[in-house]
């Protein structure tokens, strides 16, 4: 066997398809509306901006390795025990820590057909095998998940609400899923868009985590709180899981600005409610307008819509994306999520929302 001439990554790493974020620029277009990453058009709380500026006065100091101020703010506003909260550099880091902590080669995770790409990436990075199960009508199928569980299953990932569909699983179904899982299987509830949901049959998962040893819930500050640039996530989990994750977590995984701005953001309930009200108004308007144009829209409870395009080549999702991009509107292609003829659109500023509708009206003529 020939000796390698340079360092080699471990087996499987080069088989991982790298995550591709939503594009931000269009060549030759000066003014661009980025509607591809589900960012809030209202931005963060003014209090979060001020806390961020104040944190800049102490950059010579290491951050609090326990992120105590942020964990206290989360605990107080959510009514939780601070000991059950761990913060991370985005919920992506926390999902990765879960996989590093609980997966080994030969283990399996279950992800759903249109599930968030990071679940698969982190599973493979840990040397385990992701098993994909079908969804039903663009919604998570509990029976399909339970049928996919084997002796090798260690983690089940559920995005609720789901991305890129914007659909949600009623909480009785989440409870049914949990009841059907072996006690050693970890159920991960990724509730990144929970704050946007206003449905009586939806719960983010706090009670289920509180009363069980094999359920965790992850949340983010990148959506309703408008702080994706600071990368802030948190997990609510049983103490034994928090303890295990802390053993491999980096000692200063949260920076000072993120801790300060996050604490201020989650305490500003008025800004959150303002953001929810804005989203509800324009989500409904966009859904109605796209439907009027003859486009099918998957019913969404989030801050984005999945728009389905006709089968004819002249009006495909790819053609629509090119048309919109030339006019400065960047939506997200979702072929990699199993929707080759759909685009995902963030609810954006009013002028962008109206502009996309006007552009698609012209495109579909």
Swiss-Prot record:
Source organism, top-level taxon: Bacteria
Entry keyword set: Amino-acid biosynthesis, Aminotransferase, Histidine biosynthesis, Pyridoxal phosphate, Transferase
PTM sites of type N6-(pyridoxal phosphate)lysine: 223
Cofactor(s) in the UniProt record: pyridoxal 5'-phosphate
One example of a Gene Ontology biological process annotation: L-histidine biosynthetic process
Reaction(s) catalysed (UniProt annotation): L-histidinol phosphate + 2-oxoglutarate = 3-(imidazol-4-yl)-2-oxopropyl phosphate + L-glutamate
EC number(s) stated in the UniProt entry for this protein: 2.6.1.9
Keyword Transferase: yes
Pathway the protein acts in: Amino-acid biosynthesis; L-histidine biosynthesis; L-histidine from 5-phospho-alpha-D-ribose 1-diphosphate: step 7/9
Gene Ontology MF terms in the entry: histidinol-phosphate transaminase activity; pyridoxal phosphate binding
EC top class named in words: transferase
Pfam families, per the entry: Aminotran_1_2
Family matches, as HAMAP family: HisC_aminotrans_2
Subunit structure as annotated in this protein's UniProt entry: Homodimer.
UniProt similarity note: Belongs to the class-II pyridoxal-phosphate-dependent aminotransferase family. Histidinol-phosphate aminotransferase subfamily.
Record's protein name: Histidinol-phosphate aminotransferase
Top-level taxonomy: Bacteria, Pseudomonadati, Pseudomonadota, Alphaproteobacteria, Hyphomicrobiales
């Amino acid at each position: 066997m020939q000796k390698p001439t340079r360092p080699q990554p471990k087996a499987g790493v080069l088989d991982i398809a790298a995550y591709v974020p939503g594009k931000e620029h269009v060549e030759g277009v000066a003014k661009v509306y980025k509607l591809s990453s589900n960012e809030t058009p209202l931005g963060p709380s003014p209090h979060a901006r001020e806390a961020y500026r104040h944190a800049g006065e102490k950059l010579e100091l290491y951050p609090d390795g326990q992120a105590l101020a942020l964990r206290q703010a989360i605990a107080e506003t959510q009514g939780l025990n601070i000991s059950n909260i761990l913060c991370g550099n985005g919920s992506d880091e926390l999902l990765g820590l879960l996989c590093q902590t609980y997966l080994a080669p030969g283990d399996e995770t279950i992800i759903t057909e249109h599930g968030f790409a990071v679940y698969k990436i982190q599973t493979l990075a840990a040397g385990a095998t992701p098993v994909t199960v079908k969804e039903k009508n663009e919604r998570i199928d509990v029976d399909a998940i339970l049928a996919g569980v084997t002796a090798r299953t260690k983690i089940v990932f559920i995005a609720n609400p789901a991305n890129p569909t914007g659909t949600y699983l009623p909480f009785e179904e989440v409870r049914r899923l949990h009841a059907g899982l072996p006690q050693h299987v970890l159920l991960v509830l990724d509730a990144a868009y929970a704050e946007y949901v206003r449905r009586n049959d939806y719960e983010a998962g706090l009670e289920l985590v509180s009363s069980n040893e094999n359920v965790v819930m992850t949340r983010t500050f990148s959506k309703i709180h408008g702080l994706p640039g600071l990368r802030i996530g948190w997990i609510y989990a049983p103490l034994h899981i928090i303890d295990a994750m802390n053993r491999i977590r980096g000692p200063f995984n949260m920076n000072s600005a993120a801790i300060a701005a996050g604490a201020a953001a989650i305490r500003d309930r008025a800004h959150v409610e303002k953001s929810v009200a804005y989203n509800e108004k324009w989500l409904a308007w966009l859904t109605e307008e796209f439907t009027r144009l003859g486009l099918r829209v998957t019913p969404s409870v989030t801050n984005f819509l999945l728009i389905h395009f006709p089968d004819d080549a002249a009006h495909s999702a790819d053609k629509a994306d090119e048309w919109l991009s030339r006019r400065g509107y960047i939506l997200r292609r979702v072929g990699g999520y199993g929707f080759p003829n759909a685009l995902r659109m963030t609810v954006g500023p009013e002028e962008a929302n109206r502009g996309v509708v006007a552009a698609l009206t012209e495109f579909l003529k």
